[in-house]
């Protein structure tokens, strides 16, 4: 597949820069929609409206496993609240998107993930919601969800100390030094580490 070919091309860079930089491959399986449309490989892997989610999860998991075997770390956006149960053990970095950063449920899921999780600023460029999400995800949470075998369970998390803000723009770009300083100041004000 094209994804595996890309991972093969990326692998030498992972090895070359391993002392100074963590290189990972962006592998997104879910597509947030403002209204309607194709929601991604997990939801509709055949691109035909059949919504064969079981196959989508299997394909996603196999792809992540194959990428890991090549020595390449994978990063993905966690959109659906249940799919992390099936793929999170193969994900080295996660993102919570601009449309879901304010969601209490996504903050709770992030608090239990075993990888660093970045929260994107809002679609309007609002940084505070991302900072608040990082602050919420570092704490333990308790919530109802489903286990891998489909049983209802109460989950308890210990918090995720590796949360961070993703500057993704909004009404205008926000990757300049002033925007980074503003994000750092908001993190400090919230009692969080502004590290890069």
What are the functions of these language-model segments?
Residues 7-184, 189, 195:
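Active-site-facing alpha/beta catalytic cores
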Residues 1, 193-196:
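Short acidic catalytic loops
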Residues 4:
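Single-stranded RNA-binding surfaces
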């Amino acid at each position: 597949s094209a994804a595996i070919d890309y991972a093969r091309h990326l692998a030498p860079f992972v090895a070359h820069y391993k002392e100074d930089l963590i290189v990972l491959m962006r592998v997104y399986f879910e597509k947030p929609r403002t209204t309607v449309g194709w929601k991604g490989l997990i939801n509709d892997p055949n691109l035909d409206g059949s919504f064969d989610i079981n196959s989508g999860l299997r394909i996603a998991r196999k792809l992540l496993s194959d990428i890991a075997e090549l020595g390449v770390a994978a990063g993905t956006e966690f959109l659906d609240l249940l799919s992390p149960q099936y793929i999170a053990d193969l994900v080295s970095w996660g993102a919570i998107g601009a449309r879901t950063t304010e969601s209490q449920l996504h903050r709770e899921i992030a608090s239990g993930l075993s990888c660093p999780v970045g929260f994107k600023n809002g679609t309007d460029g609002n940084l505070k919601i991302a900072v608040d999400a990082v602050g919420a995800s570092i704490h333990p949470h308790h919530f109802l969800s489903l286990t891998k075998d489909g049983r209802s369970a109460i989950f308890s998390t210990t918090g995720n100390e590796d949360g961070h803000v993703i500057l993704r723009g909004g009404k205008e770009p926000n990757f300049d030094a002033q925007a980074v300083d503003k994000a750092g100041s908001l993190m400090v004000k919230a009692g969080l580490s502004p590290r890069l």
